């Protein structure tokens, strides 16, 4: 079985080289075109080989299965291969994306949901196939957790939640939330809450008891900030490193410093990208931000904790044509 994986994983030092050597995965460039990936998948499938693809292309931030490109249905129909839908549950709480390498002890489950023959796929439209895939794979981790709570034990359960949450719901300030052990506190107004082993949140006057609802509120606030920004920066993040990315040949340092997002431009160290020219934006892992502007690809990293996911919401709002991937 050949797995479709991010091209950037294959550049991740010795581990990336081992993955490439042992698995021969099909590379997919973050925030870039998927045309070459699709062609490789079709070639393997028509040779009778198995290909595994996660249609969302990303791990969820809020526990809800993300949307995927509508081309998945067309690919499944034209491949001439059978389609097996396989659903994983429990992974969101066992290894939260915002937590980095923190693993929690709990229950995960995986099982095949449906097998569609080539004949069944040919009898459906690409849209109907997509609807079946959504029906088979959709998951809301918090909805499941409310019905059947499972504990996911570990250390420092809340640490690095700042990678997801950057707005205090009490005072409204940005970048004032700080995590330690299982607690997050706003250093400006004193608001605080705890992250429980079940993934739920508890605290005095806390408006949300889960990260799904908090994230939905925060996305709405990001849209508001974009609309009200006028000529002022919407976000500013300090101490970042920007590299340009060349397909298959690594990265090259562009500059270090601060990044700022305006309604019309993304300012990076030694580069300014008009928002209208941004064609793709995505995240690798918890906070490596990938930006595509035509044939030029950038990766923005930092050794300190940042909430980079906010740029995905903002840029997809400011430029409706941008290809958006979490």
Residue ranges and their predicted role:
Residues 72, 125-141, 308-319:
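Short amphipathic C-terminal alpha-helix that caps PH/PH-like domains
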Residues 116, 127-164:
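A conserved mid-domain beta-alpha-beta active-site/ligand-binding segment of alpha/beta enzyme cores
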Residues 1-131, 147-148, 171, 182, ...:
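Soluble catalytic domains of membrane acyltransferases
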Residues 201-258:
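Anionic N-terminal interaction surfaces
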Residues 153-206:
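Cys/His-rich short segments
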Residues 86-88, 176-178, 193-195, 257-263, ...:
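Broad, structure-driven detector of short, well-ordered beta-strand segments within folded domains
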Residues 277-326:
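Acidic, Ser/Thr- and proline-rich intrinsically disordered linker/docking segments
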Residues 259-289:
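Phosphoinositide-dependent membrane-docking surfaces
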């Amino acid at each position: 079985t050949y797995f479709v994986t991010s091209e950037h994983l294959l550049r991740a030092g010795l581990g990336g080289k081992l993955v490439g050597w042992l698995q021969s995965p099909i590379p997919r460039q973050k925030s870039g075109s998927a045309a070459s990936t699709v062609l490789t998948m079709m070639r393997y499938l028509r040779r009778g080989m198995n290909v595994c693809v996660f249609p969302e292309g990303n791990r969820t931030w809020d526990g809800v299965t993300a949307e995927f490109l509508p081309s998945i249905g067309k690919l499944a129909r034209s491949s001439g291969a059978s389609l097996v839908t396989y659903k994983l549950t429990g992974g969101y709480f066992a290894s939260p994306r915002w937590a980095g390498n923190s693993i929690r002890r709990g229950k995960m489950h995986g099982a095949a949901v449906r097998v569609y023959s080539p004949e069944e796929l040919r009898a459906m439209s690409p849209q109907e196939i997509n609807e079946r895939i959504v029906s088979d794979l959709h998951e809301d981790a918090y909805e499941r957790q409310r019905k059947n709570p499972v504990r996911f034990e570990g250390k420092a359960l809340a640490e690095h939640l700042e990678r997801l949450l950057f707005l205090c719901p009490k005072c409204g300030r940005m970048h004032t939330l700080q995590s330690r052990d299982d607690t997050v506190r706003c250093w400006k107004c004193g608001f605080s809450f705890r992250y429980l082993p079940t993934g739920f949140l508890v605290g005095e006057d806390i408006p949300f008891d889960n990260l799904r609802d908090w994230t939905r509120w925060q996305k709405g606030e990001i849209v508001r900030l974009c609309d009200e920004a006028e000529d002022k920066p919407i976000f500013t993040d300090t101490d970042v490193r920007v590299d340009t990315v060349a397909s298959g040949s690594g990265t090259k340092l562009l500059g270090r410093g601060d990044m700022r997002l305006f309604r019309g431009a993304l300012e990076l160290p030694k580069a300014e990208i008009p928002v209208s020219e941004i064609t793709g934006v995505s995240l690798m892992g918890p906070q490596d931000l990938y930006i595509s502007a035509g044939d030029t690809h950038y990766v923005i990293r930092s050794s300190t904790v940042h909430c980079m996911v906010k740029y995905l919401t903002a840029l997809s709002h400011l430029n409706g044509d941008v290809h958006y991937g979490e």
